[in-house]
Amino acid sequence: MAAPVLRVSTPRWERIARVLVCLLGILLSLYAFHVEREHARDPSYKALCDVSSSISCSKVFGSRWGRGFGLLGSIFGNDSALNQPNSVYGIVFYAFQLLLGMTVSAMAALILMTTSIMSVVGSLYLGYILYFVLKDLCVICVTTYALNFILFVLNYKRLVYLNEAWKQKLQAKQD
């Protein structure tokens, strides 16, 4: 016997928060991509996020860790198609979170949660590199780390909410 189809929806505040967080993430990632491209084209380029020598996003984006998380170039080679600027991965991640967040399937909720966990782990890794290795503060980077954590919380709340809603709907169908 097939599993019953249970129609539920997520709270409106969650959908609005997801759209805002994902759009902000996409915009910041596009700006990071722009800064990296301009800095590569003109090394004297000064981005809006370059406040001082220790608060500089273009210094971070231009570093080894600004592409492929500092790992993919070592594994696949610097010319590999996978060794893209981190901002490209950010654009894909936030677009994916936005689009998949429009569905309420159990599989989508699990994928959203799994990718959020991966983004938080990646943020912790890059935050460590930022602070302890590069000894820099990148406002764009830190903001995206915060957005990743907010998405993690949203996805966790979504999973809990949908689980509870499905339980209630299933209970009502059985009664």
UniProtKB/Swiss-Prot annotation:
Which positions in this protein are listed as binding phylloquinone? 141, 145
Q: Where are the transmembrane segments?
A: 13-35, 87-101, 107-134, 138-159
Show which residues sit on the Lumenal side of the membrane: 36-86, 135-137
- State which ranges are Cytoplasmic (membrane side): 1-12, 102-106, 160-175
Q: How is its activity regulated?
A: Inhibited by warfarin (coumadin). Warfarin locks VKORC1 in both redox states into the closed conformation.
Tell me, what is an example of a GO biological process annotation in this record?
A: vitamin K metabolic process
Q: Does the keyword NAD apply?
A: no
The EC number(s) given in the record are 1.17.4.4
Report the locations given in the UniProt record: Endoplasmic reticulum membrane
> Which reactions does this protein catalyse?
phylloquinone + [protein]-disulfide + H2O = 2,3-epoxyphylloquinone + [protein]-dithiol; phylloquinol + [protein]-disulfide = phylloquinone + [protein]-dithiol
Extract one GO cellular component term from the record.
Answer: endoplasmic reticulum membrane
This protein's name: Vitamin K epoxide reductase complex subunit 1-like protein 1
Task: Name the gene behind this protein.
Answer: vkorc1l1
